[in-house]
Every structure is written in C-alpha cells, then in structure tokens.
Design a protein with these regions (language model features):
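N-terminal small-domain helix-loop-helix segment of the aminotransferase-like
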Residues: 2-90, 97
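Conserved core of the PLP fold type I
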Residues: 53-168, 183-206
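Residue-level marker for buried hydrophobic side chains located in beta-strands
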Residues: 176-177
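Walker B catalytic acidic pair
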Residues: 180
C-alpha cells in the first residue's frame, strides 16, 4: 500500500508560492489548510461554554446542530428538497474515508486536485480515475468527486458544468460528491453549490 501512495511535491510549489507572496493583497496559503487568522470570539466563547461536557459527542450531532446545518444549506447554498446532514471533523477526513465507507470500486476525481482524493481511493483499494471537467467525457464509476472552487486552480464550475455532473451521476447510478470547502472564497466569479441544481432530487448527491 505505501508504495502506491503519491509523494506530494512540496518543493515544486516553492516558485508559485513566491509569486503569490508578491501579490499586493498578500498570499492566501491553501497548501495545508493551516489557520492563520485569529479565532473569532464567537467560537472561543462556544468552546469555553462547552468545556465541561464529560461525554463523547453523538456522531450525528445534536438536533440543534443538525437544524443549524440544514438551515445554512438552504439559505446559503440554495439546497432544496429532502436531504440529511452529518457533521464531520473536516472535509479532508470525509474525502479520505468515503470510498472505503461506500466500498467504491471505481473513483473519479479531478485531474488537477488536492492529493487526498487519490489517497482515499487507494486506501479503499478502489480504481482511481483522474478526469477533466467535462462530465460528458467521464467513464462509468460508482463514486465521483467534484471540487469547486478548485484547489489548487481556484476554478469555479459553471451551472451547466455542475448540471452535467448530476446527469452523469443519474445515468451511471453513481454517488456524486461536490467538495465545496472553499465556496466562500470566490473572487471574480461567485461560486454556487451543486445542491442548488438538483431540482430537489438529492438522491446520491453529497
């Protein structure tokens, strides 16, 4: 297994990091997801208030948390129809373990992408398949990852591109997962969620 895992080319990123640091507004380093900004007081207060909770949290989250996530998805992402919510430690954890949990045989992931999509497929002993953006060119698979806005390119998928991925998923009876962890990082184009374009049918869409 170890010999199949990719080596991440940190050295290859060095010249691009130098270019980014020359930007007038500074660089936003998304290479490791390490927080650099002060923790908001709201979060600090919530952590202090919950520090005397001597039990492990319920995996599914409290009803209050589930309702808050659901309302956020409706109001912020434009989600509609019936859908469930599940809190995770972070999107990277889900990316790494979902192919194993779903027992996926073939996993599609963006050809230019954060390495965890490939690593997750390899850990599950699935067949990883790197693809371009056009879903019409994708082969059949049982799990597909979309990443918008993209890390590392920053590219935002259009409505037609996202709808094409949904059509592909329906045709292949596949699970389609859109990693939108950077959805609030729009610049010249405002990112929109895949959930906005399901027309209320969220089956096999994450």
């Amino acid at each position: 297994m170890r010999e199949k895992l990719p080596d991440f080319p940190w050295d290859a990123l060095a010249p691009y990091s130098e270019i980014a640091r020359q930007h007038p507004d500074g660089a936003i380093d998304l290479s490791q997801g390490t927080p650099v900004d002060p923790t908001p007081q709201l979060i600090q207060s919530a952590l202090r208030e919950s520090s005397n909770s001597p039990r492990y949290p319920v995996t599914a989250g409290t009803k209050e948390l589930q309702e808050a996530i659901r309302n956020w998805a409706i109001n912020h992402l434009g989600a509609s129809g019936d859908f469930d919510v599940l809190p995770v430690i972070g999107s990277k954890e889900l990316v790494a373990w979902l192919p194993t949990l779903l027992q996926s045989q073939k996993v599609i992931y963006p050809e230019i992408a954060y390495p965890t999509y490939l690593v997750g497929a390899l850990l599950a002993q699935s067949e990883p398949i790197a693809v371009g953006i056009a879903a019409a060119d994708w082969p059949s698979a049982d799990l597909a990852w979309v990443n918008t806005p993209s890390n590392p390119t920053g590219r935002v998928h259009s409505e037609s591109e996202l709808r094409a991925t949904i059509s592909w998923a329906r045709q292949n009876s596949a699970t389609l997962v859109c990693d939108e962890c950077y959805i609030d990082f729009g610049d010249s184009v405002a990112p929109t969620s895949l959930l906005k374009y399901t027309d209320g049918d969220n089956s096999n869409i994450l």
